[in-house]
Amino acid sequence: MGLGKKLSVAVAASFMSLTISLPGVQAAENPQLKENLTNFVPKHSLVQSELPSVSDKAIKQYLKQNGKVFKGNPSERLKLIDQTTDDLGYKHFRYVPVVNGVPVKDSQVIIHVDKSNNVYAINGELNNDVSAKTANSKKLSANQALDHAYKAIGKSPEAVSNGTVANKNKAELKAAATKDGKYRLAYDVTIRYIEPEPANWEVTVDAETGKILKKQNKVEHAATTGTGTTLKGKTVSLNISSESGKYVLRDLSKPTGTQIITYDLQNREYNLPGTLVSSTTNQFTTSSQRAAVDAHYNLGKVYDYFYQKFNRNSYDNKGGKIVSSVHYGSRYNNAAWIGDQMIYGDGDGSFFSPLSGSMDVTAHEMTHGVTQETANLNYENQPGALNESFSDVFGYFNDTEDWDIGEDITVSQPALRSLSNPTKYGQPDNFKNYKNLPNTDAGDYGGVHTNSGIPNKAAYNTITKIGVNKAEQIYYRALTVYLTPSSTFKDAKAALIQSARDLYGSQDAASVEAAWNAVGL
């Protein structure tokens, strides 16, 4: 972020900047250290010992022992928010920095412990300077902050709706960074609704003055414009269920019990999720059902991909229902992940055909859900471009016939984007050509759909060097284990190198590093 201390501690020298190697610790390997890293902290500065137990308490005691390295006792400023064990047996503790009990917005610290109970890597944003820069006090209540947020987006609670579901609003007090590099107590307000149009607003409200520090509609989509063909007319097998004398697009076949459910909005932009798609027989063959068939079939395949490859149970890894709504709006040129489900427009026929007709677009949107529940990459600037890129990359992993994204739904051009040749569709493929676009809706929040071409090309370089099977494991591990909300391109490079080293060793880690070097990073 540049507003706090960017922290990266690891045995791997490839973790860029502020890198610390822990003595006596090995992950897959223990490479030679590079002494020219910026702000390098020598390994003898750390007290290293095997943790007596792998627990929050033991880790905080370890951090306390290393107080000089972290400029104080970081254990007093960290709150545990998640703990996972990966397939290698490594444990990962995800913390949020706090100030007087208030979490710091968009900051996380992840502490990684190997199978021998040694801390082998630490990365994230510690934000040592937050306390000194918090320059206000809390005067507003959460409800008052919600009122300010509604005014900022030009809506009222009465004017929006989630259909039959209660409004999904929340206001959480946090320490938020301002443009001048300081921090203020602010409410992180989330407002989600589906009527009169889908929205997933995040509004930052100053807790003292009510001033809007930031607002963003975080409805994430594959593209704002595009083209496509008509649905193919191909016959596919569907997992459905029989309910009340009819057949419906509800997939109950998954071994985990996760449901995949497909609805029809009948060209409305309200009453989400819509009407459950049904038939009097077990055949869904009418022209109005074709978009739903594609959405249902594709999502079943995408679920199977994440479950079979990574043992991931739905986007949230908790078996959450996977919901799609097709025929959203009239001639709507978009597909979107809106925080808890997907929507698909029918396209205008000249730029897009129905957007559910593309396997890689469906996988792209589902990956936004996975990202939301793991790294939660901010949807702006470099983190936002990474958010889009990881969705594109997993879109490719689900449809490896070509390097294009969206080729099955575009009408007036061959595809939306290309991993192998980003410049073909107006994206940069090297960091020297990074587009510094404004962080506004009109500027695509810093060019998240434009600058994603750079990490996309790095992914292409990686895949062509080490193959799909290794690359997809490396990318999934980086996304779910190492990345944090404010991760930059360099952080992604470091996370992918470390993931390659964890899984496959130094040779493949070097291939990943070379892939990113080739795009100017």
Swiss-Prot record:
Temperature dependence: Thermolabile.
Residue span(s) of the pro-peptide: 28-221
InterPro entries the UniProt entry points to: FTP_domain, PepSY, Peptidase_M4, Peptidase_M4/M1_CTD_sf, Peptidase_M4_C_domain, Peptidase_M4_domain, Zinc_Metalloprotease_M4
The protein's required cofactors: Ca(2+); Zn(2+)
GO BP terms in the entry: proteolysis
Cofactor note as given: Binds 4 Ca(2+) ions per subunit.
Record's function text: Extracellular zinc metalloprotease.
Family: Belongs to the peptidase M4 family.
Protein name: Bacillolysin
Origin species: Bacillus amyloliquefaciens
Lineage, highest ranks first: Bacteria, Bacillati, Bacillota, Bacilli, Bacillales
